[in-house]
């Protein structure tokens, strides 16, 4: 921690999530952004990309400007900029970075992410699912974090939406089995027009004018953060031509019979209690753009869901897959720091 008591963070990869994690960090008084690494963007271009955002609007908290080729100024706050391609070359230690947000989408396993430790960082939070780093979803299993874990994953935006909802339903009524569909906004890996995508042919089709079926590991990943649900959930995705905000459709068979009103009441109670700020609840006639900038992980839409019987129900929950997720990255870091 810095002399001000703030947690010092660095960001590797200044893409969608990297820039929004920076915004979230700069809006908080318990976090200090001290360094950013991106080999593909100059400092003046970083300033422009940070300041102007087609989805979340212009940054208005303070002026952002270039001090020199290695320093950005956010108001009076200087942030060091590196341009290293290899994580082990980034001198995080020189700037006092304790926690690195690994948001390139490239270094998602423990071995690759560990390179940041060589550069002087103490901990790494991967902003994507990881095949071998332990995954944490704030509000669900972050209490299982142990201080000796140096590299962790914040899971995916969809897992962060699904897991709190699934936890409430499983705790209260028990889930026998379930299927999830996420209707998901476009992301950076998609194509503006039809183009090559060898591993996912459908994913190479134009994002702006297609509904594209896709795979997602989000439902299975819930089994990693909630072992009681391991093997009970799976799912798929539809990529749709919206710039941000996605929605989870969770259809489950319940162990304990419950009316839809009882399910709504349970979710509402949790949203105002232990999961306040993580799980939301609304009975308004909302649509996707109403959730742009919502920092909660999952907002249950009481009017959109429907029950077939007391044991079989469809539940609908919204999430800003960019802003909500980026908010949880910072929350996870704050929780990790509190255990030291």
UniProtKB/Swiss-Prot annotation:
CC terms in the record's Gene Ontology section: cytosol
Catalytic activity: D-glyceraldehyde 3-phosphate + phosphate + NAD(+) = (2R)-3-phospho-glyceroyl phosphate + NADH + H(+)
Keyword Signal listed: no
Biological processes annotated in GO: glucose metabolic process; glycolytic process
Binding site for NAD(+): 16-17, 38, 85, 321
Site feature Activates thiol group during catalysis, where: 184
UniProt KW keywords: Cytoplasm, Glycolysis, NAD, Oxidoreductase
Keyword Transmembrane helix: no
Positions bound to D-glyceraldehyde 3-phosphate: 156-158, 187, 216-217, 239
Subcellular location: Cytoplasm
Active-site annotation: 157
Enzyme class of the recorded protein, top EC level: oxidoreductase
Gene3D superfamilies in the cross-refs: Dihydrodipicolinate Reductase, domain 2, NAD(P)-binding Rossmann-like Domain
The protein's annotated pathway: Carbohydrate degradation; glycolysis; pyruvate from D-glyceraldehyde 3-phosphate: step 1/5
Family: Belongs to the glyceraldehyde-3-phosphate dehydrogenase family.
Described purpose of this protein according to its UniProt entry: Key enzyme in glycolysis that catalyzes the first step of the pathway by converting D-glyceraldehyde 3-phosphate (G3P) into 3-phospho-D-glyceroyl phosphate. Essential for the maintenance of cellular ATP levels and carbohydrate metabolism.
Name by which UniProt lists this protein: Glyceraldehyde-3-phosphate dehydrogenase, cytosolic
Organism whose genome encodes this protein: Ginkgo biloba (Ginkgo)
């Amino acid at each position: 921690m810095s002399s001000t008591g703030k947690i010092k963070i660095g960001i590797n990869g200044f893409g969608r999530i990297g820039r929004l994690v920076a915004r979230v960090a700069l809006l908080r008084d318990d976090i200090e952004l001290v360094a950013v690494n991106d080999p593909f963007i100059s400092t003046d271009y970083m300033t422009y990309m940070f300041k102007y955002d087609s989805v979340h609007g212009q940054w208005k908290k303070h002026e952002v400007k270039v001090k020199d080729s290695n320093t950005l100024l956010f108001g009076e706050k200087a942030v060091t900029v590196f341009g290293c391609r290899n994580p082990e070359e980034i001198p995080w230690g020189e700037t006092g970075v304790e926690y690195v947000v690994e948001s390139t989408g490239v270094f998602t396993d423990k071995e690759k992410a560990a390179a940041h430790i060589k550069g002087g960082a103490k901990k790494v939070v991967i902003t994507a699912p990881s095949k071998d780093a332990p995954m944490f979803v704030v509000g669900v299993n972050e209490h299982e974090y142990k201080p000796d874990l140096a590299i962790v994953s914040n899971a995916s935006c969809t897992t962060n939406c699904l897991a709190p909802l699934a936890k409430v339903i499983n705790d209260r009524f028990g889930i026998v089995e379930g299927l999830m569909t996420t209707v998901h906004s476009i992301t950076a890996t998609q194509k503006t027009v039809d183009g090559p995508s060898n591993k996912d042919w459908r994913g190479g089709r134009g994002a702006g004018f297609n509904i594209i079926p896709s795979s997602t590991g989000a439902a299975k990943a819930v089994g990693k953060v909630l072992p009681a649900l391991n093997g009970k959930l799976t799912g798929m995705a539809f990529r749709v031509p919206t710039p941000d905000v996605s929605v989870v459709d969770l259809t489950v068979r319940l162990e304990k019979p419950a009316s839809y009103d009882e399910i709504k009441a349970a979710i509402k109670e949790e949203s105002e209690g232990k999961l306040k700020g993580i799980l939301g609840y609304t009975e308004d006639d909302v649509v996707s753009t109403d959730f742009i900038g919502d920092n909660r992980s999952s907002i249950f839409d009481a009017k959109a869901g429907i029950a077939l019987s007391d044991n079989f129900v469809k539940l609908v929950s919204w999430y800003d897959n960019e802003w909500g997720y980026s908010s949880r990255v910072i929350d996870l870091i704050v929780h990790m720091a509190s255990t030291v």
